[in-house]
């Protein structure tokens, strides 16, 4: 066994009919964790449904159906391997809660793969004012996904098929609009592909002899290649934030007989170790960590990305709950937010939003109503430049700086300090009406909280 490959998370974005599912299905199918038996079963079912209907998308539809029904499917089905990386597709749109997931997401994507359809009239539909292509790309950039790969799909259905002119036209237009969003097109590979036929997916296509390959320039090093797989292999692996202070948002708190209280969550930044004195905000409870476990094995330290359970001393299940954040009591401990300033982008709200609006915010694992206390300024969502002070209201498409006040105690952080705790989705009318990034937090000095005896004792050591 060689050295373990690096794990990378990607998110696949693009318009409904761009062929995302087929393209993603193709990668998972050819390089992924789906075993032969499952594939044969899918193929047989597809053949029974009318033989031509088997496409790679079928694989994804089966997986999606299982995901939607709440069956925890074997997560390896959403993984595939490249020469350098193990890649996990953390979400693909078309899923009801895609936008919310992308924000509160179980993990941050290291790279977004944007699929645009090259077929006649299709590209135009996806890129039109209300097409989702723009919204998804804007969202990815706003949420800190700084690497982008573009697959110009369905090259087999251009006029004429595999048209160089069409590919160049689309590349030019997409470059212009990702540049407006904030991406630098020189760093973005554009790959002409057919997710169904497999052109330029894993192997260079013989149908496009004119395509000499993609080239990118970036300060971390230039790269070039021909296929989509090679482009994925050129992703720059993220620096995992182990050096930052600990932040661990709780997903659940269990009471386990004979052990005691066990909070469960994902380490977002920093390191969690047995023996540490942790503080939970906004509950303001401090105690000692007795042990840390992942997949029923004791750990000496848990790192960013690890989903762990940890046993805490002298704390009841009533003291802490989902949405609380654990941190190191001696190193920038988490605190309750009295209020915070955020940059929000209104995505789809049927009316006008004015001061006093109080929707529910989903930020990390917290789910709390927050009031838009003050609309400070309307800004240009691309450049961030101020357009007007104290706007009376905001509508779909607007970006603004707002002051927000949580309706109940809540712990959030600025995006620049702790990214996963600094981005949120605004939910109303069962949909995501806005997304936001926290610029600054007014932290509330807590009145004396509960400090357990074990914490006091361990603190004296």
UniProtKB/Swiss-Prot annotation:
InterPro entries: EFTu-like_2, G_TR_CS, GTP-eEF1A_C, P-loop_NTPase, T_Tr_GTP-bd_dom, TRAFAC_GTPase_members, Transl_B-barrel_sf, Transl_elong_EF1A/Init_IF2_C
Keyword terms, alphabetized: Cytoplasm, Elongation factor, GTP-binding, Methylation, Nucleotide-binding, Phosphoprotein, Protein biosynthesis
GO biological process, one term: translational elongation
Chain positions with 5-glutamyl glycerylphosphorylethanolamine modification: 301, 374
UniProt xrefs under PROSITE patterns: G_TR_1, G_TR_2
Stored Gene3D superfamilies: P-loop containing nucleotide triphosphate hydrolases (3.40.50.300), Translation factors (2.40.30.10)
One Pfam family hit: GTP_EFTU_D2
Binding site for GTP: 14-21, 91-95, 153-156
Region annotation G3: where it falls in the sequence: 91-94
Region G4, residue ranges: 153-156
Start and end residues of each stretch annotated as G1: 14-21
Main location: cytoplasm
GO molecular-function term, one example from the UniProt record: GTP binding
Modified residues (N,N,N-trimethylglycine): 2
Annotated segments matching region G5: 194-196
Domain of life the protein comes from: Eukaryota
Chain spans, region G2: 70-74
Free-text tissue specificity from the UniProt record: Oocyte.
Function in brief: This protein promotes the GTP-dependent binding of aminoacyl-tRNA to the A-site of ribosomes during protein biosynthesis.
Protein name according to UniProt: Elongation factor 1-alpha, oocyte form
Organism: Xenopus laevis (African clawed frog)
Upper taxonomic lineage: Eukaryota, Metazoa, Chordata, Craniata, Vertebrata
Gene that this polypeptide is encoded by: eef1ao
